[in-house]
Amino acid sequence: MRFSLLDRRVERNGVLELARKHHVTIIAYSPLAQGLLNGRFHDQPQMVHNLSGYRKFMPDFRESNIKATQPLIDELKKIATAHQTTPAQIALSWVIQVHGDLVVAIPGATTVRQAEQNARAMRVKLSQVEVQHLDEVSLAIAKK
């Protein structure tokens, strides 16, 4: 199931509660929203014009969505700075932590470096305040 700071539908459509009730783990794919949560497209918006494949046609990568998600990227960067890590690692850490063992993240990686960075997200421990701040910003803009 898709699950990220930008796609939280499983929290609203009953899937999460059903999984909890039946002790089923949800495997969250696209926990970085196809790379949108790493902040690169916000820092360099022209990168959107170089997208290929299906991402080229995804509404998530339209200029209007890049602007709409900027507050979340700003919060991810702020928390990442405090933890001396990356926004992507903070976004992954949130997915890993927010529902405990009920959700497992499977981020994609196209390079060894990305895979290593993704794995490092398991070391990041967000405080309740940080989780709350991410929740507040995320809930204002996420798919529900």
Where are these regions (language model features)?
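Beta/alpha (TIM)-barrel catalytic core signal, keyed to glycine-rich beta->alpha loops juxtaposed to Asp/Glu
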Residues: M1-K143
